Design a protein with these regions (language model features):
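Sec/Tat signal peptide C-region and signal peptidase I cleavage site
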Residues: 16-20
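A beta-strand edge to alpha-helix "cap/lid" segment located at domain peripheries
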Residues: 21-49, 56-145
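Sec-dependent N-terminal signal peptides
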Residues: 4-14
């Protein structure tokens, strides 16, 4: 009996990441992809549509921006993404709130200075009036081998 219990427990733990990935919402997946594209080609309209007024946007450097500062950095070119690749994405929806985790690799040209970044990102989304909008985002640097 103990053996069966531990086998079930092991299977439940192993299935956790798979279940989290499958508990997403197709509309949320579309919103995350739209946000990725908006970071590369930002406009006031697409950023406003995808983010909440209460946005808190945490960078891996420790800098935290509100919505206005986040948008200003993108629209001015101070933060300039040439390309972005998201991988190992998982998501979980709880009511009208969801979290999304992924690895974020980007080629940048911040203020005209070429570079690249590799991050682990956690995003919190809320569904308002049938649309997913970003409420919070926090990134940490990923050490590359």
């Amino acid at each position: 009996m103990k053996r069966a219990f531990f086998l079930v427990l092991l299977l439940a733990v192993a299935a956790g990441p798979v279940l989290a990935q499958e508990s997403g919402d197709p509309e949320l997946t579309i919103a995350v992809e739209a946000f990725r594209k908006a970071l590369i080609d930002p406009t006031q309209v697409n950023l406003d549509k995808l983010t909440m007024n209460e946005l808190t946007y945490g960078h891996s450097s420790g800098m935290i921006q509100d919505k206005a500062a986040f948008e200003q950095a993108l629209l001015s070119g101070a933060s300039d993404f040439v390309s972005i690749d998201l991988s190992q994405q998982t998501m979980h929806v709880v009511g009208n709130t969801a979290w999304v985790r992924h690895l974020f690799s980007a080629v940048t040209n911040d203020g005209g200075k070429p570079g690249e970044t590799h991050l682990s990102v956690l995003m919190v989304w809320m569904k308002q009036k049938g649309q997913w909008r970003l409420l919070a985002r926090q990134a940490v640097k990923v050490v590359q081998p």
